[in-house]
Amino acid sequence: MKSLQALFGGTFDPVHYGHLKPVETLANLIGLTRVTIIPNNVPPHRPQPEANSMQRKHMLELAIADKPLFTLDERELKRNAPSYTAQTLKEWRQEQGPDVPLAFIIGQDSLLTFPTWYEYETILDNAHLIVCRRPGYPLEMAQPQYQQWLEDHLTHNPEDLHLQPAGKIYLAETPWFNISATIIRERLQNGESCEDLLPEPVLTYINQQGLYR
């Protein structure tokens, strides 16, 4: 049986412990040996990043340098068009073949808006969804047809993610860290400490580059 590959996308502006620690816990919970981080270049759902793509890439490299669980995929950074998860997962599926189990990691907030994503209905054709639970967010989708979609694909057994190549949604009980890139940027702008929010090499680089001031 081929091992489950997991992808983790985002803007990472900047990368912080709220990104890394839940995924590290997730890896232990469901038996992931490798998580590929895919930073967006031009995120279609959010304002443009404050740090440029190369700065965000370098911060990620610093953050995961001592973490063998993580590796970096730059394909979306090399696009000059918006980064769409559906497109990236189609590419990954074509590269890996039809039988390799593949999963995409998202937060619970993203699950609730998932039906607004570009070609969202194709994503489960190519991968599983692993959802990191977050307090304060409902477990139900906003509309009945999307709730039915969720229930049709939902599994409570993480082993299903390893046994099938795609098509399942798993809600993972991961720790919640009240950290966001927005909070970090605001604290940096106000000259407040962020030492407990992100890896030290990343903070050193931010200060050296004068980012988020």
Swiss-Prot record:
Domain of life: Bacteria
InterPro entries (UniProt xref): Cyt_trans-like, NadD/NMNAT, Rossmann-like_a/b/a_fold
E.C. no: 2.7.7.18
Gene Ontology molecular function: ATP binding; nicotinate-nucleotide adenylyltransferase activity
One Pfam family it belongs to: CTP_transf_like
Pathway in which this enzyme or protein is active: Cofactor biosynthesis; NAD(+) biosynthesis; deamido-NAD(+) from nicotinate D-ribonucleotide: step 1/1
Catalytic activity: nicotinate beta-D-ribonucleotide + ATP + H(+) = deamido-NAD(+) + diphosphate
Keyword field: ATP-binding, NAD, Nucleotide-binding, Nucleotidyltransferase, Pyridine nucleotide biosynthesis, Transferase
GO BP annotations, alphabetical order: NAD biosynthetic process
Top EC group: transferase
Cystine connections: none
HAMAP family (alphabetical): NaMN_adenylyltr
Family according to the record: Belongs to the NadD family.
Functional summary from the UniProt entry: Catalyzes the reversible adenylation of nicotinate mononucleotide (NaMN) to nicotinic acid adenine dinucleotide (NaAD).
Protein name as it appears in the record: Probable nicotinate-nucleotide adenylyltransferase
Organism: Escherichia coli O1:K1 / APEC
Phylogenetic placement of the source organism: Bacteria, Pseudomonadati, Pseudomonadota, Gammaproteobacteria, Enterobacterales
